[in-house]
């Protein structure tokens, strides 16, 4: 047992970020209700961050917060806020203003070293050989995830690395959960409820029709989710 009553540890979580493009609370409320109806098991009562960077018109923050909360989503913070008055309103309600991560400055080139022995790098992988059923959640921390069987609707795959599904993919796949934007998702039969790479996601209705039910490869290109045939 620890000698101290609390312990602070760093951690990371996969959160949905709702980018607001409209200052009218009623419009946002209805749009969120429609999205939640498309993927209720994923979005119902989900914690979210509201990004307000695209808002150009003044916003009634109290009404906006109520409109979002009325859908069942739990607002845990706000990002992209540059307006001092809006910041004050948000902080008055007890919500934190979150600063989105910036790209790190490039590290200086390392000093020359003696040639290393010719060894192959080892990449960890979590392998699942059985079907992933509705309600199951599989997480592969700091590695890739490979599923050789079917993934049912309502099941969830999460990996800090890439995700490979060599069966029918009907559930949710979240690659790059720790923020790695170079990760990808590979499916032999893409029928997912949701696909996400480093927080950028599509719901099932956003997957291009020509790739639905087909072998596909998803990745981020210029910070946007893209899909192409899996050759």
Swiss-Prot record:
Pfam families: MinC_C (PF03775), MinC_N (PF05209). Disulfide bonds: none annotated. It comes from the Bacteria. InterPro entries: CAP/MinC_C, MinC, MinC_C_sf, MinC_N, Septum_form_inhib_MinC_C. Keywords: Cell cycle, Cell division, Septation. GO terms for biological process: cell morphogenesis; division septum assembly; regulation of cell division; regulation of cell septum assembly. Belongs to the MinC family. HAMAP family: MinC. Cell division inhibitor that blocks the formation of polar Z ring septums. Rapidly oscillates between the poles of the cell to destabilize FtsZ filaments that have formed before they mature into polar Z rings. Prevents FtsZ polymerization. Interacts with MinD and FtsZ. This is Septum site-determining protein MinC. The lineage of its organism: Bacteria, Pseudomonadati, Pseudomonadota, Gammaproteobacteria, Enterobacterales. The gene is minC.
């Amino acid at each position: 047992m620890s000698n101290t009553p609390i312990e602070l540890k760093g951690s990371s979580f996969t959160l949905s970020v709702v980018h607001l493009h409209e200052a009218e609370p009623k419009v946002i409320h209805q749009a969120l209700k429609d999205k939640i109806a498309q993927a209720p098991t994923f979005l119902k009562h989900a914690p979210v961050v509201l990004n307000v960077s695209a808002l150009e018109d003044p916003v009634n923050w109290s009404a906006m917060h109520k409109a979002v909360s009325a859908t069942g989503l739990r607002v845990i913070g706000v990002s992209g806020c540059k307006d001092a008055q809006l910041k004050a309103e948000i902080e008055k309600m007890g919500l934190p203003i979150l600063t989105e991560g910036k790209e790190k400055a490039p590290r200086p080139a390392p000093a020359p070293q003696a040639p290393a022995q010719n060894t192959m790098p080892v990449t960890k992988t979590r392998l699942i050989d059985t079907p992933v059923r509705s309600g199951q959640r599989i997480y592969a921390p700091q590695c890739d995830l490979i599923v050789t069987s079917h993934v049912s609707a309502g099941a969830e795959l999460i990996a800090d690395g890439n995700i490979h599904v060599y069966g029918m993919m009907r559930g949710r796949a979240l690659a790059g959960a720790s923020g790695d934007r170079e990760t990808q998702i590979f499916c032999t039969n893409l029928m997912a409820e949701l696909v996400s790479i480093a927080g950028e996601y599509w719901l099932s209705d956003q997957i291009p029709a020509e790739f639905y039910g087909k072998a596909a490869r998803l990745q981020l290109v210029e910070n946007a989710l893209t899909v192409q045939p899996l050759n």
